[in-house]
Amino acid sequence: MSTSPAARPTSNPHLLGWVDEMAKLCKPDRVHWCDGSEAEKKRLTDDAVAAKVLIPLDQQKWPGCHYHHSNPSDVARVEHLTFICTPTKEQAGPTNNWMEPKEAYRKLGAIFDGSMKGRTMYVVPYVMGPSTSPFAKVGIEITDSVYVALNMGIMARMGKVALDRLGDSNEFNRGLHSVADCNPERRFICHFPQDNTIWSVGSGYGGNALLGKKCLALRIASYLAKNEGWLAEHMLILEAESPTGEKQYVAAAFPSACGKTNFAMMIPPAAFPGWKIRTVGDDISWMRVGEDGRLWAVNPENGYFGVAPGTNRKTNPNAMDSVRKDTIFTNVARTPDGDIWWEGMDHEAPAELIDWKGQPWKKGSTEKAAHPNSRFTAPAKNNPAISPLVDDPKGVPISAIIFGGRRSTTVPLVLEAFNWTHGVYLGSTMGSETTAAATGQVGVVRRDPMAMLPFIGYDCGSYLQHWLDMQSRIPNPPKIFLVNWFRKSAEGKFLWPGYGDNMRVLKWMLDRAAGRAPAKETLLGYTPGDAGLDLHGLDVSKDAIAAATRIDLGEWEQELESQAEWFEKLGKTLPAPLALQRELLLERVRAARKVK
């Protein structure tokens, strides 16, 4: 086994000992320590192209951009193969898969044994968060995938900067990854919160293989956050600047396919001249209490790992600008001359394409050319609307926390929580409706507390209790809101136009956070009332707005029954104050129905 010239660029005995131990287990032909330099990026990219792992795109149209086909069986996160390996099953809770830690190390160790024979082991040091921030966490990912090493170089602050931050400390996340034989039968993503360790084998896909992202920044970090008194959340962070120059910051949690990246990169409508929205982060937020008693947030990531289909100049022009250079596209469609395409792009499909499986594709085919979960990995600095505070080690002060799911009925356009506990209740019961394709039953609500269901690194009830406990730590807490852009008419049409027009709802929330907007009290929370939203220049009927904001008592009685089933699933660790919130709301709804 050889080690590359950038050999062992650290004297940290804890790190060196662990890398040697993992090399002994995986048996690579050579070890390469990543330094994060541009020269290294070029060298690794050339290696990946030579190995046909990456395909260069037309460098005139897409400078510095490359294409990657994944194995067709390896195209998404695999929740059923993702495990939380706490000492007891109760610590993982009823919403996570659990594996006993010793058994997990034994089972995965047998797959890792010799898995890197004939391959290079890349040692990828990285920092999540601005490198000088008190928020920052160091991780080391060992991987046999050059694709993963290059993606980590985009998604995190990678290389020497991480080793400098680490020094001789033993406090780093130990991440071991191997594609191995990419066999779904031998695919496991295991998290060991007590050991600050992640082992992932059998997948090269982003969320399973880029261990800094969901694995460390959410699953492991949520456990660390509980113990250390902060929050690690599946939230975008955006900066809103008013025409007068006032800047406010919000964090927002939406489950997948609910427009998180679009909201983070929103362009306000023409009716809002002078307003600017800038992106601090599009996916993950780490929040701590500042010296001023407010909640301060950083984006631990350094890039965007976005879903390509549906992204276009209308829905998200800033995302389209972000992917113009130095981006890796995974499982989209491409043309033989080095262009790319996906469903929902601005122009129609070319007559002929190479689809995401590498097969010829003709216009009119019933098969999708790009995989529905095809992705782009783009540097955050490419975003023309990035916030200048994105690298600020202090983070940004959060005025409002927003929760939102995809509900075609029941949930109104916007609600403000009565208080922190009520806000945690709204977040704990949020969710999205399944489609017929997913379950055979349309409209079944999949609860997704704080959009964190697949990402909580310990028991869900204890996680919700941690949210409640945070109230006593935050003297000046942000206001909490619930939004729903997706309510439909009886004919199945969206009632609210969404996209840039979500600025109208955001403005009301910002004004409420600043204490300068009126609100109407309802049994569900505070709403804008008839005149609270700025609707000038909006081509939507009054009836549609009324339907989008309506509170239907019959629907809410059903909703609360469904919430009871969800709370029952959480078991004995469900915080009593949340059960009480549901009971009080049920009483209010029933009393209001009797009055009617």
From Swiss-Prot:
- Transmembrane stretches in the record are none
Q: Where is this region: Disordered?
A: 362-388
Kindly give the InterPro entries that the UniProt entry links to this protein: PEP_carboxykin_GTP_CS, PEP_carboxykinase_C, PEP_carboxykinase_GTP, PEP_carboxykinase_GTP_C, PEP_carboxykinase_GTP_N, PEP_carboxykinase_N
Which pathway? Carbohydrate biosynthesis; gluconeogenesis
Per the UniProt entry, the Enzyme Commission number(s) are: 4.1.1.32
Residues annotated as binding Mn(2+): K214, H234, D283
Summarize where GTP binds, as residue positions: A257, C258, G259, K260, T261, N262, R375, R406, Y499, G500, D501, N502
Active site location: C258
Q: Which GO terms describe its molecular function?
A: GTP binding; manganese ion binding; phosphoenolpyruvate carboxykinase (GTP) activity
Q: Which cofactor does it need?
A: Mn(2+)
User: How, per the record, is the cofactor bound?
Assistant: Binds 1 Mn(2+) ion per subunit.
From the Swiss-Prot or TrEMBL record, state where the protein is found: Cytoplasm
Main location class: cytoplasm
Q: Does the keyword Manganese apply?
A: yes
User: Where on this chain does substrate bind?
Assistant: R77, Y205, G206, G207, S256, N373, S374, R375
Q: Which UniProt keywords apply?
A: Cytoplasm, Decarboxylase, Gluconeogenesis, GTP-binding, Lyase, Manganese, Metal-binding, Nucleotide-binding
| A cellular-component GO term for this protein | cytosol
Report whether GTP-binding shows up as a keyword of the record: yes
The UniProt entry's GO biological process terms, in alphabetical order, are: cellular response to glucose stimulus; gluconeogenesis; glycerol biosynthetic process from pyruvate; oxaloacetate metabolic process; propionate catabolic process; response to lipid; response to starvation
Q: Which PROSITE patterns match?
A: PEPCK_GTP
Give me the reactions it catalyses: oxaloacetate + GTP = phosphoenolpyruvate + GDP + CO2
What is the annotated quaternary arrangement, including any partners? Monomer.
Q: Which family does it belong to?
A: Belongs to the phosphoenolpyruvate carboxykinase [GTP] family.
- Its job: Catalyzes the conversion of oxaloacetate (OAA) to phosphoenolpyruvate (PEP), the rate-limiting step in the metabolic pathway that produces glucose from lactate and other precursors derived from the citric acid cycle.
Q: Which PANTHER family match?
A: PHOSPHOENOLPYRUVATE CARBOXYKINASE (PTHR11561), PHOSPHOENOLPYRUVATE CARBOXYKINASE [GTP]-RELATED (PTHR11561:SF0)
Name the UniProt record assigns to this protein: Phosphoenolpyruvate carboxykinase [GTP]
* Phylogenetic classification of the source organism: Bacteria, Pseudomonadati, Myxococcota, Myxococcia, Myxococcales
